[in-house]
Structure formats: structure tokens, C-alpha cells
Amino acid sequence: MSKQDSLWFKSLRWLQNKLVHTIVVPHEPFKDLNLDPDKPLAYVMKTESVSDIAALSEITADLGLPSPYQPLEVGGESAPRVVCLEGAKPLMGKRESNHFFLNSFMSLLKIHKERPELDIQLVPVSLYWGRTPGKEDDTMKAAVLERENPTWLRKCLMILFLGRHNFVQFSSAVSLRYMADEHGTDKRIAQKLARVARVHFSRQRKVMTGPVLPKRQALFHALINSETLKKAIQEEAASKKITEVEARAKAMEYLDEIAADYSDSLVRIAERFLTWLWNKLYKGINIKGAEEVRRLHHDGHEIIYVPCHRSHMDYLLLSYILYYQGMVPPHIAAGINLNFWPAGPMFRRGGAFFIRRSFRGNKLYTTVFREYLDQLFTKGYSVEYFTEGGRSRTGRLLAPKTGMLAMTLNSVLRGMKRPVTLVPVYLGYDHVMEVATYHKELSGKKKKKESVWQVFGALRKLGNFGQGYVNFGKPITLHSFLNEQKPDWKEEIAKEPEQRPKWLTPMVNTLANQVMTNINDAAAVSSVTLTSLVLLASEQNALERSQLEKQLDLYLKLLKDLPYTSYTSVVEGDGKSLVQQGLELKKIKLDSDPLGDIISIDESIAVAMTYYRNNIIHLMVIPSLVASCLTQHEHISRDEIIDIIKDFYPLLQAELFMGVEDTDKLVGQILDLFIAQGLVTEDDGFSIIETEVNQLLLLAGTVGETLQRYAIIFNLLAVCPKMERSDLERESHKLAQRLGALHGITAPEFYDKKLYGALSVKLKELGYLSDNGNKVDVQRIRERANGLLRSSVRQTIVDSVTAEHKD
């Protein structure tokens, strides 16, 4: 009988199974790590441990992986399934020599030398009983629970106290065939493999647990005694005519107001509550791109998460997902408005640090905050902040606030050694709890101050919220970004280290725009967002069920055959399944009559549904604009369509943070897809297949309100070419209100003053707001915008502009 089948081992495994709850990272190793099920597989573990191997054996069957107790049989030879780098640590004395374990590596390499067709996948496996990072001061708790190499007695205590928080992490496989072919099969290579594996396990532990935590007061005193803060305190005392002791006390107050007080114990408790909450709220949380972020952590990058901001849920969702993906929840920059009892202290213990909405003119506060942020970066804590500054009330990305990005870039300029990488994150929901509140705020109602009662009010409304979506976008490594934008930045900073570079502000603006673009590049298309996109483009927000399903199939075809980026995710299924999901979530309603089913958006939530449409409108705006060209111009040519898109794309790019690299190519691909789908034919120009015209009209409707805004702006500029930016914003907003009242436009963003402000900035950048000979361009774009509108809407705009500016 084998050792693991003995009564003693079976009893231990039974007891451990009762005490242990294991979380696997990543959740689907075969899929996420590209493991080949047809190739033999062996596990590499850091330390020989009965409990670790038992925990691994409990999950391998469910994952379709071989049991660690099952020997590796290759060509009649048998080898251990698990290779350990070092033996178990005895209660007393030294660990046994690692020669036995080196021999295990050598035996596997030897088999490859004898069998050229063989390729064993060597999969590193890390186990973590709890994820306590430890404190900078050694404590009894650390002595009992936080050691990397516990004795069997300490391991028993760890299982007893932390067994419900056991994580098993699989890493990308190493091909032993590649190692044997490239480096040979002798003892030297086995030793090298062991060294590389040790470094890997050490880095992996840091990714999973994070750096050790400082004592809060010790951190404060270290910061307050830094040269930068000493100087700021002296300046504060001189400028405010107070003593240095008073200025120092004020700096300590600021630190206490700002700083997080991370508690691993609270995070473990919060994990249980959030697991219950997500299971109550959502049917599932869809994640894309986590493996790339894990790799950046593993490679030693300082990670800064920059998510979009839809809801207060964002704080919880991203931290929860990162925890379950084997990464440490970040320190989160939260608005000081969230520092109310009891949420504030809990957020602070969960890693939140608080920032005032504005601290312009308060030099001491600015210096304290910057030094604290620098300390987080230096010590290796991941950080999260929202570049939009607040939650989007319309579902579109807001114009970025650049303060935190500027501080981050400054940290790099001041000599940050480790690579600093921004990770854009798209957060999406089938239901955002605050949507109704957003609509009231956009209608002029004053925003309520956050309080504990709002939290309880939100908890009362918990229900079926469908799915959540977390997509990690393309990372931006700041050292690489600086090298691309300003190749000689290091030399310039070295010459004048105290001087703020003139190029820093425009570079921060470029970086902010790139962050927002990368967030939108990682958008998640769901049944709710796509269904709202279709129905809100229809006349009465209603369609026959068969027509809606057909239209959804067309959009899915566009999104899957012509993916926006590799970071974008698209819901699985077809039009029928998407409609069914929308009905189950009560986002759309079904009415039946003898002629068939009608699907519609209830009038009471039609405005709220624009929020979900706006989450993904940028993905479909160019196909919609192409459809608009086809429906409004008979026999239009391919080149004419491309020219029209070229005129409007810079405005779309500024408004929707789009990053299409080659619009000409994309337009050509869209037209080819329309031909393949039997929507149009192409001879001298394009002709619409009469029976399919409704599909193109519906698609064109998505960009309709955007074109109306552009028509308002360019009609004003054509009549008043010398109009100032502020006047253009005011007049555009006034005409938009009139147009909305006459034609029933209810989308909140149509009346958003900030949107017209952002467009006017882009118009100035493009040269349309100056006397430099761009009048011809203005006239051309006005004609093109007018030509893509319904005649009634066009006439309203032209007449209103003429009446307002007769002189």
C-alpha cells in the first residue's frame, strides 16, 4: 500500500478537508495558462509538505489536472509527479540536504535526453495559508503564522487559524523539452532550474501577500522628518506666522486624515461579506486580462490601477477581484466625502487613503499628500485612483482630472527606480444602483451628502443585478512613455532637478488622454448595453422581437468579426439569448398581440437606459456613421464615405476617447461586412438592398444625436466664424435645449455643458475657432453634418441659427 493510502494519511487528509477552503488562482489553469492537456505534466513546489500536497490533491480532479499522488508514467518509466526544491523543515534541527530534490530534476531531464519526442510541462504551484504580509516589527503573530518555511507544528496552527483562506496558485508551465534542447540535461542545468524556481516562488509570494506593513505612527514620523516635509513645515510656519511646532502638528493632522491603516484581518472578514454580497447581487463577474497584470506584479512593477468610475461599488469590486486573482488589494485614493462613520474607518482599514476635492493654495497639504504617495510607491504598495475624479452620471467617460497622474509622473522624474505601470481598468455592470440618482442630479436636483443611511438604503434594494465586468486594459509603463514622448528627459532632469519642466503639463494631458482611451479600448459588451443601444435608436424605443434579435445578431457580427481591440470583451450568445437576458433583468418589457411579440424599454426608465448605451457607444459609432452615409446618400462611393468619416473622427475621438489607428481600413472592413451580410451592393456606388434598409436605419440612429450636436456647432461657426469659445459653448447648449424640446431628445448628455466645453477645446486645437483660413473646412463639415440629418431636424437647426444670428 502506498504511503498516501495509509490510514494515517487518509485521516490527516479527512481532517484537513474539513478545516480547509481552497481558492484556485487562476480559476481555469488550462485556459488561462495555455496548458496542453495532451502533454505530460509535473508540479514544482517550493517545500515538501504533506498538507500542501493534500490541499493540491483536493482540487486537481475538478480542474482536470493529474493528482499529485499519481506517479508520472513516461515510456515505461515512473517519476514523481511533484518535484520539491527543499525538504520539510523539522521541529528541531536543520532541513535535510536538497540533493534528493536536485536528482528529481535531473531524472526528468534525463528522460528527455533519451526520448526526443517527449515534452513534460513543469508547472510551478504555490500554496498560501492566509495572505498576511507581516509587519515591519516582528510580533508573536508573525512568529506563529507568517513564516515562509514553517515547521510541521507551525503549519498545523496555520491550517487551524487560516485554513479557510488557503490559496493555490498555478503559474505558466516551463517546457522541459525546450530546456533540454537549449541548455542540456546535466546537473548544472538542474541547479539552474532550481535557482530560477526559488526566485519565482519568492516573487510570487510578494505578489500574493504584498510588502510588509509599516507601523502607522512610525511611518508618520519617518515622513515628517524627511527633508522635503521639514522644508514645507518651515515655509508654512513663516507664511502663516505660526511656530514650527504648530506647523508640524498641522502636518501630522494632514497625515492622519490622509493615510490608510491597512488590516489583513479586516480584509479577510470583508472577503466573506463581499462573497455573500456578489452572490446576492450578481449572477457572475466576468474578468479579462488579469494574467497580464499578475505578470507585471511578478516582474517587479509598481502597479497603479486607473479604473473608470461608474458606482461606489467600484471600490469594492476591483479590490475583491484582485484578491481572488492572487494579487494584493491596492491602496485606494478615495474622496474625503467617503470618510464618514462607520464606512470611513472601515475603508481606511481596507486600504483607502483620503484626498480632498481641492487643495489648491494649501502648499503644506499638497507636500504631505505627495510625500505619502511617494512612500506608497517606494515601498511597493499597489495604488488605485480614478482619473475621472468622480462617478460618471451619463455612462460616458468624463474628461480626466490630471492631479494624481501629475504626482505619479513626478515620482518617476524624481528617480523612482522600479518600473511604474498604469493599468487602465474598465468596470461595467448590468445594473448600476445609482442610475436613478444620477438622472435626478442631471435634472438639477442637489447631490445628497454621503452617509450611513444611504448605505442602508442601497442594501434594501439588493436584487438581481445580472453580471459584473472587470476588463484590464493595455498597461502604460511610465518610463517607456517618457522615453517615447521626451527621449532626453533624464538628462534634462539631471541638469535642473528642482525646476519643473515646461513639457510636463502637456505630457500629463497626453498621458491622461491615453489612459482614458485604453479604458474604453477594454469595454465590455453585455446584453443590457447592446440591447439598449438598439432600442434607443428606434422611433418609440420599441421593436418587433424578431427585428430586435436580427439587429442584435448584426451588431454581434460586427463586434466579433471586427474586434475593436484585443482587450474588448463581447457577450456570448446570439440575439435571442440577449433578449431573454434583458427580459430576465427587467431592463426591457414584452408585449404580445396577435401579430407577434414587441420588445420595448419602459418610458419610466428610458432615460436611465441611455447610461448603459453610453458605456459602449464608442464601439459602434463608426459603423453607425457608415450606415448613416449609406441611408442618407444614394449611390455614395467608398472614397466619399471614408472622407466623411475623416472629417468627423477627430471630434468623435475627443468626445468618446477613441483609439482607432486606421479609420480608412476600418471603414473598408465595415463596408465589406455589409456586402457579405446582404445589406448593400457596390457598383459605381453603394445601393441598399430594399428589404434590409431597416437594419441600416436602426444602426444609423445610434450616431444621430451626436451628428445633431456637430450640426449645431458647425452651423453656428459657419454663420459666426469669429465666435469665441465661451460664446460657442453657450449658444450650442441653448440650441441643443431648443432642438431637444422640439424633437423629444431626452438623453442627458445631449444637454451636458461639459461635453460642449470639451468639443470646443478640440475645435480650437483643430483650428476651427480662429481666422486662419479654415472657413472652407467649416462650410464643408457643416454641409456634411446637415446632409446626414433628417430633414425636419436639419431645418430646425438651420432656422434656429439664422433667427438667432440675423445680423
From Swiss-Prot:
Q: Which InterPro entries does the UniProt entry name for this protein?
A: GPAT/DHAPAT (IPR022284), GPAT/DHAPAT_C (IPR045520), GPAT/DHAPAT_LPLAT (IPR041728), GPAT_PlsB (IPR028354), Plipid/glycerol_acylTrfase (IPR002123)
- Where in or outside the cell? Cell inner membrane
Q: Which SMART domains match?
A: PlsC
Give the location of motif HXXXXD motif in residue numbers. Answer: 308-313
Q: Would I find Chaperone among this entry's keywords?
A: no
Keyword list (alphabetical) reads: Acyltransferase, Cell inner membrane, Cell membrane, Lipid biosynthesis, Lipid metabolism, Membrane, Phospholipid biosynthesis, Phospholipid metabolism, Transferase
Its top-level enzyme class, in one word, is transferase
Enzyme Commission number(s) from the entry: 2.3.1.15
GO terms for biological process, alphabetical: CDP-diacylglycerol biosynthetic process; fatty acid metabolic process
* GO CC list: plasma membrane
Family of this protein: Belongs to the GPAT/DAPAT family.
Q: What is known of its domains?
A: The HXXXXD motif is essential for acyltransferase activity and may constitute the binding site for the phosphate moiety of the glycerol-3-phosphate.
Q: Record's PANTHER family?
A: DIHYDROXYACETONE PHOSPHATE ACYLTRANSFERASE, GLYCEROL-3-PHOSPHATE ACYLTRANSFERASE
Q: Which NCBIfam families match?
A: plsB, PRK04974.1
The protein, known as: Glycerol-3-phosphate acyltransferase
Q: Which organism is it from?
A: Shewanella sediminis (strain HAW-EB3)
Q: Which gene encodes it?
A: plsB
